[in-house]
């Protein structure tokens, strides 16, 4: 501000900053361009709790981050707080760019499995796109036949074909029974990873990213992750969606009987404690084991 003549001294420069004039934001955008910042979410349990990003200035007070890096932070969007740090020295900037960008942190430090992968709504969208409408059991000979994938996609864009309707299409030398949704998903995949003709689930996406990391550079894998994210959100919002009914949450009939049985076991443990047969620590441990066992038992029903 002083160099550009907007303020004559430091005191006046602080006043200009407080007034948030347009010149302040122009200069801020200029100095933040191509300058990494660090985002940290407590508790920092592993190195993915602090990563570097190139900031984009927006209006509002909320920090917006890529949804695929949330797993590394163990973050969700219910008001989590994050600290912002600005590396100033050349060495710290070099470390941020070459070691701390999400591009360099695609794997989980604990076991080396991919952690920066599309999940939740993105998986829902991919699953919706790659499933078949109805029961999918039609006579294959009666299905429409297309010479290649582009013809089938064009037919869908023209409105003469539904997204999850079964069709026959020639892929290379094979004739596959598939859907336009599956074709659109495969279009974003590199040629080496095609053709996936089964419903895409969370484990499938993780497998795709694992295979991609073995074949391609990190930069190419990041582009693939972004593409899966985009088509997943498109499938979960524009094309389809999910609603939960109260009838989806039916209580298992046997649950009341199981709970009553377990409460009897816990009461027996408490009685043993009252009689001095077991210690307080043993009582807590045995009670916890009983409730964990019943939780797993109900989950398996």
Predicted regions mapped to residue ranges:
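Charge-rich, low-complexity amphipathic helices
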Residues: 50, 118, 122, 250-251, ...
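Feature marking long nucleic-acid-engaging regions of large polymerase/nuclease enzymes
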Residues: 1, 47, 56-281
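Extended, highly charged clamp/arch subdomains and adjacent linkers
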Residues: 1-49, 55, 69-72, 188-194
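Gly/Pro-rich turn-and-neighbor structural signature
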Residues: 26-43, 281-301
């Amino acid at each position: 501000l002083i160099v550009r003549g907007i303020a004559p001294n430091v005191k006046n420069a602080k006043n200009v900053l407080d007034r948030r004039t347009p010149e302040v934001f122009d200069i801020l955008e200029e100095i933040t361009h191509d300058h990494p910042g660090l985002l940290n979410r407590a508790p920092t349990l592993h190195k993915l709790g602090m990563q570097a990003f190139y900031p984009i200035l927006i209006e509002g007070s909320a920090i917006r981050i890529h949804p695929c890096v949330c797993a590394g932070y163990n973050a969700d969007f219910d008001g989590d707080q994050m600290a912002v740090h600005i590396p100033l020295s050349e060495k710290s900037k070099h470390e941020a760019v070459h070691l701390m960008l999400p591009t360099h942190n695609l794997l989980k430090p604990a076991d080396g499995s991919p952690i920066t992968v599309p999940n939740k709504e993105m998986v829902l969208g991919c699953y919706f796109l790659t499933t078949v409408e109805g029961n999918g059991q039609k006579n294959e000979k009666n299905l429409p036949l297309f010479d290649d994938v582009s013809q089938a996609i064009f037919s869908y864009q023209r409105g003469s074909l539904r997204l999850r309707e079964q069709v026959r299409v020639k892929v290379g030398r094979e004739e596959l029974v598939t859907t336009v949704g599956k074709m659109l998903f495969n279009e974003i995949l590199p040629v080496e990873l095609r053709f996936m003709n089964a419903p895409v689930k969370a484990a499938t996406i993780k497998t795709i990213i694992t295979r991609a990391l073995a074949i391609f550079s990190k930069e190419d894998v990041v582009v693939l992750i972004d593409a899966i994210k985009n088509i997943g959100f498109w499938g979960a919002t524009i094309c389809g969606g999910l609603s939960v009914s109260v009838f989806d949450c039916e209580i298992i009939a046997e649950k009341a009987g199981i709970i009553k049985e377990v409460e009897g076991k816990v009461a027996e443990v408490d009685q043993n404690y009252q009689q001095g047969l077991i210690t307080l620590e043993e009582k807590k441990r045995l009670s916890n084991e009983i409730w964990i066992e019943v939780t797993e038992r109900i989950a398996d029903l």
